């Protein structure tokens, strides 16, 4: 921390901007005497080295600046271009198989830490493009001294919310196993069609990993049980997390489950409807506890629709998430029980909570 540094080296000059100074005070660090405040385009010459400062707000804090050393052509990039994971004795990205050992951590770092701020990242990349950068030193992860174009291309894709892989991510949240079984069968059917697929049980896997692959894949299937007339909580947490990170331009599909009142599909569609350019395939699979005899054909149809959409073949039937299919019949506003019929008898009472017909809505 700056405070610890100044205790050990009281003559140190802290170089920062005005917002950084305000944050130092908020964290109860005494404002250092003789601090040097800099802004966009300012330079600092230390002899052979001249550092130029560039603002990078919200990548990923509002005060962030990066600095460029013109002598050695080094970009000190703060959190940009960083990764999760320990170095384990490795200093440079070209000393490892980055795709195998680091790419997943780099993507997970970007999506979870910076992913919401794609426009700000693109603005920083535009500034960097005008510099003769030959080495990138981030705060987290290995240093880059080769293949900088590879790194920049990844960031451009992530920051513009473009998928890296045309394939399907399946995220399932199951209570008694019925939803998980259906999700597993769908994954098998997609694999049989040659479609790249990744399956996660969001009750077991932390949502940060699923969010990362949501940025990676072009298509996402959300499969969730109904819980207390809502979305099973691990799935709701994932959906909220994806929405909060501003993911967009994806095609999705839904599998909902509910032993007596399946409602998760409609609610998942509502959350997806708040996101930009999220489309849903028409094929929504509804389970009641588990796959019923003959329902495997619904999964086959969903696999066909997903495969066609992934391949960009004849346009798969899609609809705006706001128009996602609604359950047929009438739903109890108290407990969520669905009465499947075109009409509701006036003397009807909910078999679950006992409420009268007046407490039902279409």
Q: Where do the model's predicted regions map?
A:
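Active-site HxH/HxHxD metal-binding segment of metal-dependent hydrolases
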Residues: 1-44
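FMN-binding flavodoxin-like domain, especially the glycine-rich phosphate-binding loop
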Residues: 87, 98-136, 141-143, 185-200, ...
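Residues immediately within or flanking Cys/His clusters that coordinate Zn2+
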Residues: 329, 347
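Metal-dependent phosphodiesterase/nuclease catalytic metal-binding core
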Residues: 66-109, 114-137, 142-172
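Short, non-ligating residues that shape and space the ligands of small metal-coordination modules
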Residues: 341-342, 358-362
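Catalytic core of the metallo-beta-lactamase
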Residues: 28-96
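Short, charged N-terminal beta->alpha structural module
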Residues: 171-193
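Short cysteine-rich clusters marking metal-coordination/redox-active sites
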Residues: 332-335, 350-353
């Amino acid at each position: 921390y700056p405070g610890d540094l100044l205790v050990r080296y009281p003559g140190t000059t802290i170089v920062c901007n005005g917002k950084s100074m305000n944050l130092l005070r908020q964290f109860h660090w005494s404002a250092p005497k003789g601090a040097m405040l800099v802004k966009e385009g300012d330079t600092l010459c230390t002899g052979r080295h001249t550092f130029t400062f560039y603002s990078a707000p919200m990548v990923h804090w509002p005060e962030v600046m990066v600095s460029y050393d013109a002598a050695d052509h080094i970009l000190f990039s703060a959190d940009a271009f960083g990764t999760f994971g320990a170095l384990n004795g490795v200093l440079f990205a070209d000393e490892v198989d980055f795709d195998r050992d680091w790419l997943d951590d780099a993507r997970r770092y970007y999506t979870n830490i910076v992913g919401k701020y794609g426009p700000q990242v693109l603005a920083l990349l535009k500034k960097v493009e005008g510099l003769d950068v030959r080495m990138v030193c981030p705060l987290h992860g290995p240093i880059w001294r080769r293949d900088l174009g590879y790194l920049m291309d990844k960031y451009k894709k992530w920051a513009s919310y473009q998928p890296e892989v045309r394939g399907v991510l399946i995220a399932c949240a199951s209570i008694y196993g019925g939803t998980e079984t259906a999700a597993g069968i769908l994954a098998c059917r997609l694999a049989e069609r040659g479609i790249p697929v990744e399956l996660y049980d969001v009750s077991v896997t932390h949502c940060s990993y699923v969010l990362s692959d949501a940025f990676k894949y072009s298509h996402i299937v959300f499969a969730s049980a109904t819980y207390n007339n809502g979305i099973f909580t691990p799935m709701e947490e994932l959906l909220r997390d994806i929405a909060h990170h501003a993911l967009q331009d994806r095609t999705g599909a839904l599998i909902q489950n509910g032993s007596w009142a399946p409602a998760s599909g409609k609610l998942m569609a509502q959350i997806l409807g708040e996101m930009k350019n999220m489309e849903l395939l028409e094929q929504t699979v509804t389970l009641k506890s588990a796959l019923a005899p003959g329902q495997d054909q619904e999964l086959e149809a969903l696999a066909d629709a997903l495969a066609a959409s992934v391949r960009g073949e004849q346009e798969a039937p899609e609809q705006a998430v706001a128009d996602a299919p609604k359950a047929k019949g009438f739903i109890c506003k108290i407990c969520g029980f669905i009465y499947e019929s075109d009409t509701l008898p006036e003397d009807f009472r909910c078999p679950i909570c006992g409420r009268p017909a007046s407490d039902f809505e279409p």
